[in-house]
A protein has these predicted regions:
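An alpha-beta-alpha
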Residues: 213-255, 260, 358-376
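Short, solvent-exposed amphipathic alpha-helices that sit
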Residues: 80, 118-132, 211-215, 237-256, ...
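Hydrophobic alpha-helical segments within soluble ligand-binding/sensing domains
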Residues: 202-229, 244, 248, 269-278, ...
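Flexible loop/hinge segments that line or gate small-molecule binding clefts
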Residues: 144, 166-214, 255, 293, ...
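N-terminal helix-turn-helix DNA-binding module of bacterial transcription factors
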Residues: 2-104
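Periplasmic-binding protein-like
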Residues: 161-169, 228-230, 262, 280-291, ...
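N-terminal helix-turn-helix/winged-helix DNA-binding helices
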Residues: 42-47, 85-118, 122-124, 132-135, ...
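Flexible loop/turn connectors
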Residues: 24-27, 32, 257, 275-383
Length: 383
């Protein structure tokens, strides 16, 4: 052991060229840390001390300004500090800063499928929001696996992130290790869009049951009575809730719940493409496709069969993603705005990082919107 301080629970170990820094139970790993921190051969050509000497202020004042920390420094001096730093191409040493401030100004995001247009948009919106507040965001993808969720969580904590946004890959997973890991994280965690029920953790999501209800209710209002549902209900709470909304809308108007019109599909285009063959063999006049990828798989099958929307069958999609611009006619869809989701998720995280979060976990439920376009045919009332 090279250094220890029981008061602040900090210790530094060295194993060969690897330095292990433990801060309140969190382990950070660095190679050749002395060179990194010292910048002896590479890195900054100017130091905080040199900038401070040039502007006539203390190094601590310069550090506060360059790290965007609250301080009582005039606007004129702030401008001078930033001009000198820019002229000398000064780049703050983030590793050294994180050791001093006990924060890395980095956050982590785990999504199930980065190829999904919705999750890609969510990641982009969240990264932008984090950057506006001075945070960098590490974006990772679990491939929908609870085991990979667990491994990525551990990797992000090891790399010293200040908090984690988690979109779980398998909401029905009974993986005790993942539950234990989330419950005992040394940093704040916010579950986004999807959640493991019963886990005490901040959650931000849209009302998926309401979304399924709104989509189906709209089809009913347009005269449709035989409405198929293509949904991922076996491995997804979001899919299960959207299915519940679909069934609620049918019950409200006295239509039967017909299991022959409910079809299972994972949130991937090939899965939806395969399931769509059975959907289109029914007498359904409309389909509620419960995600953008599911809708794309359905559209691929329809195109191959030479069927048109809405002439042969009406479709309501989910997510209202950018992929919609590729198709004619444009798809009527339930919209859950990734930017709104990101804003609320970051708000929960900010409160936790600032110590303003309550002892109980917070749950934020947002209302989706129905975006009416051109993919639903209005049927005569007798249909």
């Amino acid at each position: 052991m090279l250094y220890t301080n029981r008061g602040d629970k900090t210790a530094v170990y060295r194993i060969g060229k690897v330095f292990i820094i433990e801060v309140e139970g969190r382990s950070l790993y660095f190679q050749e840390i002395a060179r990194i921190l010292g910048r002896s051969e590479m890195g900054n050509k100017v130091t905080l001390k040199q900038i401070a000497q040039e502007v006539g202020l203390s190094p601590s004042s310069v550090s506060l300004v360059l790290n965007n920390r609250p301080c009582r420094i005039s606007e004129e001096n702030r401008k001078r500090i930033k001009e000198v730093a820019a002229r000398n191409h000064y780049v703050p040493n983030q590793i050294a800063r994180s050791l001093v401030m006990r924060e890395s100004r980095t956050l982590g995001l785990i999504v199930p499928n980065i190829e999904s247009r919705f999750f890609a948009s969510l990641a982009g919106s969240l990264e932008k929001r984090c950057r506006e507040d001075g945070y960098a965001l590490f974006i990772t993808s679990s491939g929908g696996s609870a085991e990979d969720d667990l491994e990525l969580l551990r990797q992000l904590v090891t790399r010293g992130v200040d908090g984690v946004f988690l979109v779980v890959g398998d909401e029905f997973s009974d993986d005790r290790a993942l539950r234990e890991e989330v419950s005992h994280l040394p940093i704040p965690a916010v579950m986004v869009d999807r959640a493991i029920e019963g886990l005490e953790c901040d959650k931000v999501m849209f009302d998926h049951e309401m979304g399924g209800y709104m989509a189906t209710r709209y089809l009913i209002e347009q005269g449709h009575r035989r409405i198929a549902c293509l949904v991922n209900a076996r491995r997804s709470n979001t899919g299960r809730k959207r299915l519940a909304g679909y069934e609620r809308a049918l019950r409200e108007v006295g239509l039967p719940i017909d299991a022959r019109l409910e079809f299972e599909s994972e949130y991937y285009i090939p899965s939806a493409y395969e399931a769509s063959e059975a959907v289109l063999a029914t007498d359904a006049t409309a389909v509620f496709a419960s995600s953008d990828n599911i809708a794309l798989g359905l559209l691929k099958r329809l195109h191959e069969m030479g069927k048109s929307i809405p002439g042969d069958i009406s479709v309501v999609s989910y997510d209202n993603s950018a992929a919609d611009v590729l198709f004619e006619p444009a798809l009527t869809a339930i919209e859950q705005d990734p930017g709104v989701l990101a804003e609320h998720a970051f708000g929960c995280m900010s409160k936790r990082l600032a110590g303003r979060g309550g002892r109980r976990a917070e749950e934020v439920v947002l209302e989706p919107a129905l975006i009416v376009k051109d993919s639903v045919l209005k049927l005569a009332k007798h249909n």
